[in-house]
């Protein structure tokens, strides 16, 4: 076993600066299935601040205490009532704060290698902690790791308490408070009165659920970066469109073609107004590209059924809509199925269209159907790659990950920990340069990763290829 790359300096408990007045918050049908998955582990890499690390640690402790006042559930614990319902008790029990050092590691060591280095996993607390343990462990931990020329701020938060949208709202607020912002505008909404709050009971074993994937399988993890121009080129190809000289889709030319296309005219009954640029999104195009490339790399027979699973935000899909700042999980996982033969024999548009139509169909009725299905059979979420042919997309390039300025710089990079990693787990991050650039954190078996790196259709869009 390799020696630890990170040395613990101190560990303490941080309490909210003000007492909470929130009542217990019942876990929803989106929260409860996450009791069997690891805590979310996400964090940001920064250059070294222009003041001593001891001053930074004091600042972050104070800022975290003040931030918890805006997010009381994170300082609480899970409690279960006699009927089996699980709640967050906003009891101000506190969160863990860890100060660690790895002063032999430089920023270039974190972001300069092809694969994500193993030592990045040590920048996060609560390694392999399962969300059910929130009954007797803090729901949040923050670790600040001092590097030779930088600092990594890593968070681990219980996945039955937050989804990605709620997590990044917390992290952004933590950064705002640290840099002296007095008025927090994006106040979380703790309302619990939607269809997601159910009377169904999730029955669990007395010692809690276990993760549903092998945590010790050999894996490779790599960040693939896609510039805005590459993504626009990919989107245009997916939609059978042309780009103009600025790299934008030539809308005028496309609309003229559609005006004279009998098929488009015949489809008028289905859609009166056609927005050509919105048919297949940039992100769906990128997902289709990855689906095809990984399917090729896995060398399946054409009859093998593959699955591409996407998480969708339900906040704006429900009627009435949830507040965009609703705090908790408001996501559902959509599986899209296609045989390996169909994925590879059809073009990019066909693959992206399968993703597009399933996401579009996930409206208020479908969200409620998913809720009713879960209520008939309450269960934990089966996270993993059970037949070797699955891809699971998480996170989102829309999350404001690079808005986290704690007072001296924006992040140099965003990284995640070991949590919930298995063959076929993909996470989407915004690129640091912004403007629609995207980073894909791809976790695959070593042999599949090798095949992906040799896939010319995929790699032609990757930055630096």
Task: Label the predicted regions.
Residues 32, 228-239, 446-455:
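Short alpha-helical interface patches
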Residues 2-22, 36-37, 41-73, 77-401:
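Soluble acyl-CoA-dependent acyltransferase catalytic core bearing the H(X)4D motif
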Residues 386-465:
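Low-complexity, glycine/alanine/valine/leucine- and proline-rich hydrophobic stretches
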Residues 33, 139-145, 423-431:
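Short, surface-exposed beta-strand/loop micro-motifs that present aromatic residues
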Residues 23-30:
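Short, low-to-moderate order helix/coil transition modules at the start of elongated helical scaffolds
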């Amino acid at each position: 076993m390799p020696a630890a790359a990170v040395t613990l300096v101190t560990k303490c408990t941080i309490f909210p600066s003000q007492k909470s007045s929130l009542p217990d918050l019942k876990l929803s049908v989106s929260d409860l299935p996450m009791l069997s998955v690891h805590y979310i582990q996400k964090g940001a890499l920064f250059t070294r601040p222009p003041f001593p690390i001891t001053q930074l640690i004091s600042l972050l402790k104070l800022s975290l205490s003040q931030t918890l006042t805006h997010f009381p559930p994170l300082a609480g614990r899970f409690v279960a009532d006699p009927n089996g319902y699980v709640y967050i008790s906003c009891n101000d029990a506190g969160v863990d704060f860890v100060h660690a050092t790895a002063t032999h590691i430089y920023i270039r060591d974190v972001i300069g290698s092809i694969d994500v280095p193993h030592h990045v996993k040590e920048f996060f607390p609560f390694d392999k902690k399962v969300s059910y343990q929130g009954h007797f462990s803090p729901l949040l931990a923050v670790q600040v790791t001092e590097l030779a020329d930088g600092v990594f701020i890593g968070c681990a938060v219980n996945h039955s308490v937050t989804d990605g949208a709620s997590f990044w709202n917390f992290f952004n607020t933590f950064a705002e408070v640290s840099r002296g912002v007095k008025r927090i505008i994006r106040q979380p909404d703790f309302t619990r009165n939607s269809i997601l709050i159910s009377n169904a009971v999730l029955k669990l074993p007395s010692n809690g659920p276990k993760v549903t994937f092998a945590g010790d399988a050999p894996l490779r993890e790599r960040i693939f970066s896609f510039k805005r121009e590459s993504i626009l080129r990919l989107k245009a190809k997916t939609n059978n469109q042309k780009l103009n000289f600025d790299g934008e889709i030539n809308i005028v030319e496309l609309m003229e073609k559609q005006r004279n296309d009998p098929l488009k005219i015949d489809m008028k009954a289905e859609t009166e107004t056609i927005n050509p640029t919105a048919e297949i999104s940039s992100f769906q195009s990128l997902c289709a590209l990855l689906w095809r490339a990984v399917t090729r790399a896995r060398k399946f027979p054409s009859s093998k059924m593959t699955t591409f699973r996407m998480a969708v935000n339900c906040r704006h899909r429900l009627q009435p809509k949830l507040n965009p700042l609703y705090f908790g999980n408001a996501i559902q996982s959509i599986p899209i199925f296609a045989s390996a033969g169909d994925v590879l024999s059809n073009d990019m548009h066909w693959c992206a269209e399968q993703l597009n139509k399933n996401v579009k169909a996930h409206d208020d009725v479908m969200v409620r159907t998913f809720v009713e299905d879960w209520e008939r059979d309450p269960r934990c979420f089966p996270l993993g790659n059970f037949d070797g042919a699955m891809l699971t997309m998480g996170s989102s390039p829309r999350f404001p990950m690079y808005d986290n300025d704690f007072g001296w710089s924006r992040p140099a990079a965003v990284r995640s920990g070991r949590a919930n990693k298995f063959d076929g787990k993909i996470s989407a991050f915004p690129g640091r340069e912004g403007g629609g650039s995207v980073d894909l954190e791809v976790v695959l078996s070593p042999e599949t990763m090798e095949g992906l790196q040799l896939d010319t259709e995929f790699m032609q869009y990757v930055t630096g290829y």
